[in-house]
């Protein structure tokens, strides 16, 4: 049997084998990906350019948008190109790189969502100490720790993937490389590796989700003591965060907290959190946030005026 040191390439089966549906997949996900990149880049540029968006919440939103763009880019371009390709070939090195990038930016998104929840908790439950606790220096340290944690997680995942011995046929029943579909191709007992996968990715997803839900329950409970205006503003911000948390963590928990059994719905579930959620995040955070919308209007209004003067 050939093992992973001699695997030249894999073949991705993609979302569908039907030619007509592949064209539909191409159009839909091209729109989704372009929307994701444009939306998140718009948020990044707005936060960097606006003086009114200097609070820790927008500091973390900047990194969430960056992680969203990179997370989607780790899978979407190949899915789009493969939709029009007769043979969806990915080399072994490209596959391992995709596994690493997927987990690096996916984990970073999880950690940033936790930091945003911490920020909301301090802002609402400890408003007098907020400037001290969430100082710029503290926020930078937290983001650096998030990057370090993400790097450790993705390195652990790639080590597991590199240890897998593969035997032909090298057909991955997915649109991207990830540990779950790769485990199905391994010519070895994958019980221990799957246990490590669940204890790593599964534990991160499940524990982070529980931490986030509990923190937002505490935040919402504490809003009873706030004024109507303050309650409305805080509730709007928290609702946006809760929507993002549920949309992202639901599919992640489904994928990473069970044995490596392939269900027909797995690929569509993965599409939802790798491409769907990064597309929806900019819409959720801009449509429900008056400060971001106003900053965007000022930014582009000023840009139009400067162009007209020029």
Curated annotation (Swiss-Prot):
Q: Which InterPro entries match?
A: GPCR_Rhodpsn, GPCR_Rhodpsn_7TM, Olfact_rcpt, Olfactory_Receptors
Which positions, given as ranges, span the membrane? 24-47, 56-77, 99-118, 138-156, 194-217, 234-256, 268-287
Record's bilayer topology term: Multi-pass membrane protein
* The name this protein goes by in its record: Olfactory receptor 4C11
Q: Could you tell me the keywords of this UniProt record?
A: Cell membrane, Disulfide bond, G-protein coupled receptor, Glycoprotein, Membrane, Olfaction, Receptor, Sensory transduction, Transducer, Transmembrane, Transmembrane helix
Intervals, Extracellular compartment: 1-23, 78-98, 157-193, 257-267
Compartment list = Cell membrane
Q: Which PROSITE patterns match?
A: G_PROTEIN_RECEP_F1_1, G_PROTEIN_RECEP_F1_2
Cystine pairs annotated here are 95-187
Which stretches are Cytoplasmic in the membrane topology?
Answer: 48-55, 119-137, 218-233, 288-310
Per the UniProt entry, the glycosylated residues are 4
Q: Which GO terms describe its cellular component?
A: plasma membrane
| Function as written in the Swiss-Prot or TrEMBL entry | Odorant receptor.
* Species annotation: Homo sapiens
Q: Which gene encodes it?
A: OR4C11
Q: Which GO terms describe its molecular function?
A: G protein-coupled receptor activity; olfactory receptor activity
Q: Which family does it belong to?
A: Belongs to the G-protein coupled receptor 1 family.
Principal localization reads membrane
